[in-house]
């Protein structure tokens, strides 16, 4: 059985290399982290491009909303997922971008996403004001969810440095690692800007059990006003079994981007 599996793996590798060797065009995609919705969606899109666009080979690697804009702009990828406000900030050199990313072009608006925040079900943390000395897991650097967290903490009058000075920890890790930290009791808060529902939160609902934290309307009003591209969002009660009411939060729009140097006819075929 092991020999059969090994043979199939080798055969698949040769088949992929053959596709690349025979391809006229190679589309490299940067999507999202393992455990999130972007990675499997990106894999499916790349599979579709390769099967439907003649002479095309594709690849899909993990990434994040901010880093994906940098990768596509820098020519390390031709296609990527991000958020509408993130690509706008990147193009104009604002927010987390130290320089304008002018090689990026908007490809498509996909679907809304929400900023989701969860704590263990028996946690004493009721809101962001209780996180000043907590162990939080907001995502990796250059991820949009991490930037979301920073925007919210700023409105509450503190930041990551405050948490660290107070004895807390800011875990800059992946969804998978965040789930492990929550299960082991090493993280008090898990945050992610992603689709609803999301697999990592569903897993944590089952074990050890979680409670979602929302934002007061006045906070959402102010943060949306101060951060163009942020929108009003919610986690519907129907999304997770532990919810009995909607959770008000911030929202964003998931988008796809391409490098400006892609041929027009190729981009047109990709849209189809």
Model-derived segments and spans:
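Extracytoplasmic
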Residues: 24, 54, 64-67, 74, ...
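Extracytoplasmic small-molecule ligand-binding "clamshell" domains
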Residues: 37-44, 48-72, 79, 242-244
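Pocket-lining segment of extracytoplasmic ligand-binding domains
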Residues: 84-86, 93-96, 123, 158-263
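Short amphipathic alpha-helical coupling segments at ligand-binding clamshell hinges
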Residues: 263-270
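Sec/Tat signal peptide C-region and signal peptidase I cleavage site
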Residues: 16-23
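Bilobed "Venus flytrap"/periplasmic-binding protein-like clamshell domains
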Residues: 24-57, 113-184
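Short beta-strand-centered segments that line the small-molecule binding cleft or hinge
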Residues: 88-92, 103-109
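Bacterial N-terminal signal peptides that target proteins for export
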Residues: 1-9
């Amino acid at each position: 059985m092991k020999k059969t599996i090994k043979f199939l793996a080798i055969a698949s590798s040769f088949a992929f290399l053959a596709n690349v060797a025979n391809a006229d065009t190679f589309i490299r995609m940067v999507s999202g982290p393992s455990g999130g919705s972007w990675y499997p969606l990106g894999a499916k899109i790349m599979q579709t491009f390769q099967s439907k666009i003649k002479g095309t080979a594709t690849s899909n690697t993990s990434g994040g909303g901010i880093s994906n804009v940098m990768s596509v702009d820098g020519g390390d990828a031709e296609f990527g997922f991000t958020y509408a406000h993130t690509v706008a900030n990147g193009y104009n050199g604002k927010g987390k971008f130290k320089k304008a990313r002018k090689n990026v072009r908007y490809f498509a608006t996909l679907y809304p996403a929400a900023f989701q925040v969860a704590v263990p079900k028996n946690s004493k943390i009721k809101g962001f004001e209780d996180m000043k000395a907590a162990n939080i897991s907001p995502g990796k650097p250059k991820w949009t969810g991490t930037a979301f967290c920073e925007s919210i903490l700023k409105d509450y009058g503190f930041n990551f440095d405050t948490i660290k000075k107070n004895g807390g920890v800011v875990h800059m890790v992946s969804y998978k690692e965040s789930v492990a930290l929550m299960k082991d009791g090493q993280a008090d808060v898990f945050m992610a800007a992603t689709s609803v529902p999301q697999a990592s939160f569903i897993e944590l609902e089952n074990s050890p059990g979680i409670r979602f934290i929302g934002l007061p309307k006045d906070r959402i009003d102010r943060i949306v006003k101060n951060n163009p591209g942020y929108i009003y969002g919610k986690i519907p009660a129907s999304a997770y079994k532990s919810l009995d009411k909607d959770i008000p939060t911030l929202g964003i729009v998931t988008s796809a981007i391409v490098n400006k140097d892609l041929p027009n006819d190729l981009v047109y075929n990709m849209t189809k």
